[in-house]
């Protein structure tokens, strides 16, 4: 009976040892010379020129940016007929944090005395799971005048979260980053803020 109680208890203890990481979103924005043109009219959303096109979940970020722009007062349209264009760039990397120490440790001890001597050996096994992978994401958005190509606004966001959090999906990460990027739009030019 005791064995059946201890097994779930041990599993709970191990589950509690799993580390989670969720950073705030670091946001920097730059406002161009014509801020009155921002937040209104038709705008198209597309990948930035030269942006890596291999990100499988790029569409989630593009959709999150489009939704954020619509909330600001833009009318998001397809094609090249819009007066402004939002160019989106995304880079995601996965890293596995290193363990603080090895999973197995060995200790040796010895003793001598008037009644003899003795040697002891100890073996320790770390049963905690390895730390989860951490996804680091960088997203940049540049709003340009379609005709001239002039930059009206630029924003950059950085965010990290371990794969065992709700932000493991690209969609959740994209919405969190877009919400932070457009928070208090257009923002103070050159200022970096952190959004939780």
Where are these regions (language model features)?
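Surface-exposed short loop/turn segments
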Residues: 89-148
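Sec-dependent bacterial lipoprotein signal peptides
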Residues: 1-17
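Solvent-exposed loop/turn segments at secondary-structure junctions
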Residues: 50-51, 92-95, 159-160
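A structural "domain/chain start" motif
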Residues: 5, 17-72, 190-196
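Acidic helix-start/capping segments at beta-turn-to-alpha-helix junctions
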Residues: 77-97, 196
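C-terminal/domain-edge helix-coil "capping" segments
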Residues: 17-35, 128-196
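Sec/Tat-exported extracytoplasmic proteins
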Residues: 65-76, 90, 94, 147, ...
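Envelope-exposed proteins and targeting segments
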Residues: 39-41, 72, 82-86, 135-140, ...
């Amino acid at each position: 009976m005791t064995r059946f109680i201890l097994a779930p208890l041990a599993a709970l203890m191990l589950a509690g040892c799993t580390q989670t990481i969720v950073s705030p979103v670091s946001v920097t924005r730059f406002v161009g010379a014509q801020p009155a043109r921002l937040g209104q009219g038709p705008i198209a959303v597309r990948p930035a020129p030269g942006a890596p096109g291999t990100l499988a979940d790029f569409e989630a970020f593009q959709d999150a940016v489009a939704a954020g722009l619509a909330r600001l007062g833009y009318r998001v349209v397809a094609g090249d007929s819009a007066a402004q264009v939002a160019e989106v760039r995304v880079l995601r990397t996965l890293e596995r944090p290193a363990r603080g120490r090895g999973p197995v440790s060995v200790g040796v001890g010895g003793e001598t005395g008037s009644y003899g001597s003795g040697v002891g050996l100890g073996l320790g096994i770390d049963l905690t799971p390895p730390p989860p992978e951490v996804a680091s994401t960088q997203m940049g958005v540049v709003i340009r005048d379609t005709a001239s190509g002039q930059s009206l606004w630029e924003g950059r966001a950085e965010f990290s979260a371990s794969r065992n959090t709700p932000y493991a999906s690209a969609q959740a990460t994209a919405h969190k980053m877009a919400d932070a990027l457009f928070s208090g739009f257009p923002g103070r030019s050159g200022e970096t803020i952190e959004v939780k």
